[in-house]
Amino acid sequence: MATPWSGYLDDVSAKFDTGVDNLQTQVTEALDKLAAKPSDPALLAAYQSKLSEYNLYRNAQSNTVKVFKDIDAAIIQNFR
């Protein structure tokens, strides 16, 4: 059985995945509270805040991967 490859990007990804678990839990909890009292503006604001924080975190993860992809592509291009 082959051993899965592990490298720097895997470590970076794992750190993002660990952080996003907590944020996902917070978003879910805020949504559950909002669903119980949909007319409460404080709960709506809390949900929007948590969702925005989650989106920012995921965007950072996506941008990090894209930067490394671009760097790798530039390195490969320089060898041609």
UniProtKB/Swiss-Prot annotation:
It is found in: Secreted; Cell surface. Changing R80K: Exhibits constitutive secretion of substrates. Can invade cultured epithelial cells. Its main location: secreted. Binding of bile salts, including deoxycholate, to the PrgI:SipD interface may inhibit the T3SS function. Changing R58L: Non-invasive phenotype. One of its GO terms (cellular component) is cell surface. Changing S49A: Exhibits constitutive secretion of substrates. Retains the ability to display SipD/SctA at the tip of the needle filament. GO terms for biological process: protein secretion by the type III secretion system. Changing D70A: Shows a specific deficiency in the secretion of the translocase SipB/SctE. Shows fully assembled needle complexes, but has a reduced number of needle filaments. Is drastically affected in its ability to enter into host cells. Changing K50D: Non-invasive phenotype. Changing D70N: Cannot secrete the translocases SipB/SctE and SipC/SctB. Shows increased secretion of SptP. Retains the ability to assemble needle complexes, but is not able to invade cultured epithelial cells. Changing Y8A: Decreases invasiveness. Abrogates host cell invasion and effector secretion. The keyword Protein transport applies. Deletion of the last five residues prevents self-association and yields monomeric proteins that allow biophysical studies. Forms a right-handed helical assembly with roughly 11 subunits per two turns. The location of the negatively charged surfaces are radically different among the needle filament proteins PrgI, BsaL and MxiH. In PrgI, the major negatively charged surface is not on the 'face' but instead is on the 'side' of the two-helix bundle, and only residues from helix alpha1 contribute to this negative region. Belongs to the SctF family. The core secretion machinery of the T3SS is composed of approximately 20 different proteins, including cytoplasmic components, a base, an export apparatus and a needle. This subunit polymerizes and forms the helical needle filament. Interacts with the needle tip protein SipD/SctA. Interacts with the needle adapter protein PrgJ/SctI, the secretin InvG/SctC and the minor export apparatus protein SpaP/SctR. In vitro, the needle protomer refolds spontaneously to extend the needle from the distal end. This is SPI-1 type 3 secretion system needle filament protein. It comes from Salmonella typhimurium (strain LT2 / SGSC1412 / ATCC 700720). The gene is sctF1.
